[in-house]
């Protein structure tokens, strides 16, 4: 089922959906559709992911046999959507670093900075400097976990914004920004 959606085989995915509907296994349908939507389609078509969640909700509300219709719509949408695993790859990369290292959150990002000069504290009212602040610990400051997949117009726009943001020099010297 999931592999059929990942492989963009609409007919196979609908066939396997039919098998699960015949078994009246809405829990498995829901779990598998949600996992596939977020894992395989993801940022390739986030609107399709949202529509999938809505379709599952509608199917659960109306029950079978009518619930098959929104589920079929979701499957067709997911099968024919551009695919992107960039979000999964990004969190996996971050968690891999986390498993092998342990770096402290910078003091200025902590909820209540103790014994910190006011000019060294994070300024919640200065949205003009937020993208200039270094948020990763010093040892990871140049680490890039997210790498866009250019399979969809949506993720291409994200990639363009990311490129602009990565050109901005980030600093942990907050006093210099004020």
Segments predicted by a language model, with ranges:
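Terminal-proximal interaction/regulatory segments of ATP-powered molecular machines
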Residues: 7-130, 137-178
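A short helix-loop-helix "switch/interaction" segment in the helical subdomain of ASCE P-loop NTPases
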Residues: 1-7
């Amino acid at each position: 089922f999931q592999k059929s959606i990942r492989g963009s085989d609409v007919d196979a995915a609908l066939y396997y959906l039919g098998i699960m509907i015949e078994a009246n296994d809405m829990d498995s349908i829901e779990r598998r559709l949600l996992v596939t939507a977020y894992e395989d389609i993801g940022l390739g078509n986030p609107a399709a992911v949202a529509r999938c969640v809505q379709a599952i909700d509608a199917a659960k509300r109306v029950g079978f046999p009518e619930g098959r219709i929104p589920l079929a719509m979701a499957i067709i949408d997911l099968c024919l959507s551009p695919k992107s695993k960039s979000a999964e790859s990004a969190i996996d990369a971050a968690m891999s670093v986390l498993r092998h290292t342990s770096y402290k959150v910078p003091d200025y990002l902590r909820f209540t900075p103790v014994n910190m000069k006011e000019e060294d504290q994070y300024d919640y009212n200065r949205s003009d400097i937020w993208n200039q602040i270094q948020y990763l610990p010093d040892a990871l400051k140049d680490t890039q976990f997210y790498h866009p997949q250019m399979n969809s117009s949506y993720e291409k726009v994200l990639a363009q914004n990311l490129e602009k943001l990565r050109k901005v020099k980030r600093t942990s010297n907050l006093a210099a920004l004020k």
